[in-house]
């Protein structure tokens, strides 16, 4: 298992769609890009295809290669493979981080999540998500709070790891 993204942060988006990536996220992108060398721009893939999702999912090169290998293992022509190829190959954007640590988000991607002047980044293990801050608060935080409220007050989240194989 490689390095993981951790944390959350807000960043300004300029009129050209440029947004700074959290510095710690850049280190993970570098470490998870097998072709990266000091002085190079780390690569990543932004997946935007699922119309139900209100965020952009950003994959390290190692993470997307793992997904690609699993897709390739599915029977050619199967419904699952067709859907996954459309989302992860057709409706994704291979890109790089520029020399100042920014991503350029094309208008199409900004429009998909209604992103304007500010972006919210949140880690998700070997991926990270980019949200419109208000959407994250309304949708994701509300859902997380609802799920937590269903658990007993003394619940330890690490209990979810019991029986997770080697944990």
From Swiss-Prot:
Any GO MF annotation of the entry: DNA-binding transcription factor activity
GO cellular component labels: cytoplasm; nucleoid
Protein's UniProt keywords contain Manganese: no
InterPro entries noted in UniProt: MraZ, MraZ_C, MraZ_dom, MraZ_N, MraZ_sf, SpoVT-AbrB_dom, SpoVT-AbrB_sf
A Pfam short name: MraZ
Subcellular localization(s) per the UniProt record: Cytoplasm, Nucleoid
Residue ranges occupied by any SpoVT-AbrB domain in the UniProt entry: 8-51, 92-135
GO BP annotation list: negative regulation of DNA-templated transcription initiation
Record family assignment: Belongs to the MraZ family.
Protein name per the record: Transcriptional regulator MraZ
């Amino acid at each position: 298992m490689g390095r993981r993204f951790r944390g959350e942060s807000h960043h300004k988006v300029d009129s050209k769609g440029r947004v700074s990536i959290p510095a710690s996220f850049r280190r993970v992108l570098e470490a998870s890009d097998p072709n990266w060398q000091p002085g190079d721009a780390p690569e990543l893939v932004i997946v935007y295809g699922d119309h139900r999702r209100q965020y952009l999912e950003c994959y390290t090169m190692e993470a997307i290669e793992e997904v690609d290998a699993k897709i390739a293992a599915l029977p050619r022509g199967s419904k699952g493979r067709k859907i996954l190829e459309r989302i992860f190959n057709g409706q994704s954007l291979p890109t790089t981080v520029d020399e100042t640590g920014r991503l350029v988000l094309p208008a199409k991607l900004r429009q998909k999540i209604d992103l304007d002047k500010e972006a919210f980044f949140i880690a998700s293990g070997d991926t990270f998500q980019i949200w419109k801050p208000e959407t994250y608060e309304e949708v994701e935080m509300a859902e997380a709070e609802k799920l937590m409220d269903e658990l007993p007050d003394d619940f330890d989240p690490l209990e979810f790891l019991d029986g997770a194989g080697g944990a």
